[in-house]
C-alpha cells in the first residue's frame, strides 16, 4: 500500500527540455531516471526512500509510455537481483531500497552483481537511514560498497546535484562495467528545490528486444574459475576505468580552492551541514560562499 499519493505531482515528470522543475527530491530522482533512458526499475518500501516507490506507482502511465518496466519487489534481495538484466544486455536499470536494513537483505545479490560486472548501467538508489531522524541501528551503506567494490555517489543535497548524480551514475556504471550505488540521506530525499529539466528518453534497447534476442556469456557467471578472473578484472580494468571517468568528468568538486592553503575534505551529503557550521564560525556566508577551500567528494570509490 502506498504511504502517500503523488497523483498530482507526477504530472511534473512530463516537463520537457528547458522547463523548470520544482518539487521534492524523490520526485526529482524519478525525473532523472526518465531523462536517463532507464529500461526498468525495481524496489522495496523502506524509509527514507519509500516515497520513491509511491511516485513510481503513481507514474505508471508515464512509465508505460516510455517502455519502462516497474516492479514492486517482494524484498530488497529480489530488487537487487533484478539488476541482473543489465549484466548481458545494454539496459539501464535501477533498484531502490533503504540502507542498511535493505542492503543487508540484498548483500548476496549485490556481491554477485559486482563480481560479474554489468554491460548496461546499473544504479542502486539507497535511502541512507542514518543520523538525525533515523529509525534503525547506526550503520551505513558505505561498508557494502567497500566490500563489493561498488562505486558510491553521495551528491550534495540539492536538486541539480542529485539529478546530475543519477545521470552520472549510469554513465559511470557503463564506463567501468560496475554497478553504482547512489546514496540519498534522509534530508536529501525530502529536500525541495528546482532544476532545469531535460527531455525524457526511451531506452534505445528494450526489454522486449532482450527477450527476443537472448544472450549468454558464461564468463559473467560467478563460479570458479571465472570468479577469480573477476577479481583481476576489478583491479586491472574496472577500477582504472572508473578513476578515468571520475577525473575526466570532475565529479568531485572544489570550492574556494584559492582562498587559503588549508582546507576541508567533506562528503557530498554533509556539504550543507558543513556550510552552516562555517557560517556560524564566520568563515562562510548564508549564501554558501566559503572563505575556506572545500573539496567535496561526491564520488567515493572503494579501496581494495
Where are these regions (language model features)?
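Structured alpha-helical segments in the cores of large, soluble enzyme domains
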Residues: 25-27, 31-32, 49, 79-82, ...
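Residue-level recognition of beta-strand->loop/alpha-helix junctions
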Residues: 45, 97, 296-298
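Short hydrophobic beta-strand segments
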Residues: 40-42, 94, 261-266
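N-terminal signal-anchor module of multipass membrane proteins
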Residues: 9-49
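Thiamine diphosphate
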Residues: 47-174, 185
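Flexible, low-complexity linker and terminal segments
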Residues: 2-26, 156-304
